Every structure is written in C-alpha cells, then in structure tokens.
Regions:
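A short glycine-rich beta-strand->turn/loop micro-motif centered on a GG-aromatic cluster
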Residues: 134-148, 190-195
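Catalytic cysteine-centered active loop of the rhodanese-like fold, especially the PTP/DSP P-loop
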Residues: 85-140
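Glycine-rich phosphate-binding P-loop
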Residues: 120-121, 162-182
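Positively charged, proline/Ser/Thr-rich regional signature most characteristic
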Residues: 33-106
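Conserved nucleotide-sensing/catalytic segment adjacent to the nucleotide-binding pocket
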Residues: 184-254
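Flexible, polar/low-complexity N-terminal or interdomain linker segments that lie immediately upstream
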Residues: 1-54, 82, 151-158, 163-167
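Conserved NTP phosphate-binding and transfer environment spanning the P-loop NTPase/kinase superfamily
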Residues: 254-260, 264-368
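A conserved segment at the C-terminal end of the G1
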Residues: 126-129, 175-187
Length: 368
C-alpha cells in the first residue's frame, strides 16, 4: 500500500511545517505521512513484525542478528567499537537496498524514513537517499512517536463516527453482509479481517496467525482514518476480544452504544454458510476435534463424545446444527442482549438465499 493516497489524514492530527535539515531533507511528524509516496521502515525484521506503519516497506539497516551483535559490543566492549562495526553493517545494507529495492524509483519519488526513535538508523538511510537526489522525510521521534499517536487517536477517533452494529446469530452471514456493504460503497470496519480471526472458539484461520496487539491497533487506526464522519460506519457486533486480541476500549464503547441492524437466516441456511466458511475443519477433522475439547468444561464428556462421533461419521450438517442450538445461539444471544441495548429496536434483514445477489440486495436496503 504505497502512494500519496495510502493514508487519509485523521481529523485528530494537525500537520506542522516540516523542519528542514537541508534542501530536500526534512524532519516531519506523523501528521505528514500523507505527503510522501512511500514509508520506509529501517528497523530490524523483528521490530517490523511486531508493529509498523501500515503499508510501510521493510528495509532493515541492521538485521535482528546484526542489531544484537552491535548491542553486545556496545555493552561488553565499548560504544566506539559498536559504532564502528554498526556503521560498516549499515553501509553495506543501505548499498544493498539501493541496488535491490530503490533502483527503479523515479527522480520525483518522495520517501519517508523511520526507525525506533528517529535517530541514527533512519538518519543514515535518509542522508544517502537525499544525496542521490530524492526529497526525503525523516519521522521525528520515529516509531515511538508514531505509536504514541496511534494510542491517542484510538481514544478519540471512534467517538467521531456514526456506528451501525451488524448483529445476527452465528452463520447468518454478518461477514458476507459487511463485504456487500463495502462493495456497494458503504463504510465498513471489518475487525475480524484485521484480527485474522472469526471471533469464536473455532474462529482461528488456518495457516494465518493473528497479528500482535500493537499491529492490530495500527490496522484499526489506519482503517478509522479513512472514514468520513458524515456517513455511517458498519461494524460487526463484537465483544471486547477477537481471539487473543483486545478491541480498543473507546471503539468497544462506541459499538455497544450504537444502533443495530440484525440479519436473520433459517438454521439450514446458516449450516450451509458455516460449512462453506469453515471448510478447513471438514478437510482436517482432527483439528476440529481438538478445538471442541475446549468446551468440555461447559458441556461435559458425553456431549464432547457425541460431537466426536458426528465428526468421525462426517455428519457435518447434524454436527453444525447441534453446535448452533446448544452452544453458539445461547452464547451469542446472551452477549448481544447484554452489550447492545438497542438490539430490541433494530430493523431486521431476512436472508432469502445465501447468494451474492441476495447479500447485495440487503446491503442496498441498509444503505438506502
């Protein structure tokens, strides 16, 4: 996600004039992210993996191992030796990035470079890119300043929008409706997509781990910055956690206080939708059996063994319906009634068929 339109400025941020170090080289703030064509993160791979500005390009000037080596030299030998070795490593890595990552950038390319605190790592690459002839920004305060801004904005931004919570029993098609709303031009915050989790005991996605808490917050922050306060923002009715990730408190409060819309579908349609969405459990029944063990404390061994027998017999419709009636429907109903006081007054959308055309019809009905 590069280009000047990759970030839409948040109302909470007020851009300050850039502090020029030299002609074509400036120290800039988080508010000025939109002024640059590409964001370049020069921290190590490990730092980048934990969290980064969404859309940033990872170009470490010190790898995980190199950073550890320099740190050890700094503590055990001397700062001078550490800086000498570090400078050689940084120079070699910058040369490699110029050859492999930046060789095709045009003359008018405008990169923004950042590191942990806006110091020597980002300064080294910024100076070299500036010497090449590009107009370069170095993020003041680095990642730490960015992280502070994210946390501050996540308190304020959720209060600025007109939220609409999409409710409905498990398998009713809430995620499909959100995708249809977005395709029809609606504003949508898909928290489960950002969290890489469907929000239940069976909600983890195959071969796709959840992001870190910090990365999740960055993704939410970036999504919120795209929205206009003049139009509603649709979000699936969530609790405080999605998998292992915590939804920001201000966003939870805004969702729970919002008007709701409820999508309804008969049990057979819900079973069909769930079988399609959770097909990985049909192809890997052992994984499903292991997940269901988490519910043994709630339902006892007899129920778990019944579900195991249905899995072994590949009686997927019967298993899915029993899980809905016994576990998911009561749990979801209790949670939504507790957290969404406007639920009883919410308009109902009745799903006639689990087709793209039907979800488009319901989305258009919402947006009308």
């Amino acid at each position: 996600m590069s280009g000047r339109n990759a970030f839409v400025g948040a109302a909470a941020l007020t851009a300050a004039p850039a502090q020029k170090i030299a002609r074509g080289l400036s120290v800039v703030t988080v508010a000025q992210l939109t002024e640059f064509d590409e964001i370049v993160d020069v921290r190590s791979e490990g730092e980048f993996a934990e969290d980064h500005v969404p859309g940033a390009l990872s170009c470490p000037v010190l790898s995980n191992e190199e950073r550890a080596r320099v740190g050890t030299l700094y503590k055990q030998v001397s700062p001078f030796e550490a800086k000498k070795v570090g400078a050689a490593l940084i120079s070699a890595n910058i040369a490699r990035h110029l050859q492999e990552r930046f060789h095709d950038r045009p003359r008018d390319w405008r990169p923004l470079v950042y590191c942990w605190r806006g110091g020597s790592r980002s300064g080294a690459l910024a100076q070299v890119l500036h010497q090449v002839g590009w107009h370069v920004g170095q993020l003041e305060g680095g990642y730490r300043a960015y992280r502070r801004q994210v946390l501050a904005d996540l308190v304020v931004l959720p209060t600025r929008f007109q939220w609409r919570a999409v409710c409905g029993l498990t398998g009713a098609g809430k995620s499909r409706l959100l995708r249809a709303l977005e395709a029809c031009g609606g504003q949508v915050l898909d928290l489960e997509a950002l969290a890489a989790h469907r929000g239940s005991v069976l909600g983890s996605l195959p071969d796709l781990p959840q992001p870190s808490q910090k990365m999740f917050e960055s993704l939410v922050w970036n999504a919120l910055r795209q929205f206009s306060p003049s139009r509603p923002v649709y979000v699936e009715a969530e609790s405080k956690k999605i998998g292992v990730l915590r939804v920001p408190d201000a966003l939870v409060a805004a969702m729970w206080a919002s008007p709701c819309v409820v999508i309804e579908a008969p049990v057979r349609a819900r079973v069909a939708l769930l079988k399609a969405e959770y097909e990985h459990f049909i192809t890997d029944p052992a994984a499903l059996t292991a997940k269901l063990e988490c519910l043994s404390g709630l339902y006892g061994r007899a129920v778990i063994e019944k579900w195991r027998a249905l899995i072994d017999a590949a009686r997927w419709d019967e298993l899915t319906e029993d899980l809905l009636i016994r576990h998911y429907d009561p749990a979801y109903t209790r949670s939504t009634l507790k957290h969404y006081p406007s639920l009883s007054r919410a308009p109902r959308l009745r799903l006639a068929a689990a087709t793209d055309a039907e979800f488009t019809r319901l989305a258009q009905q919402c947006l009308a």
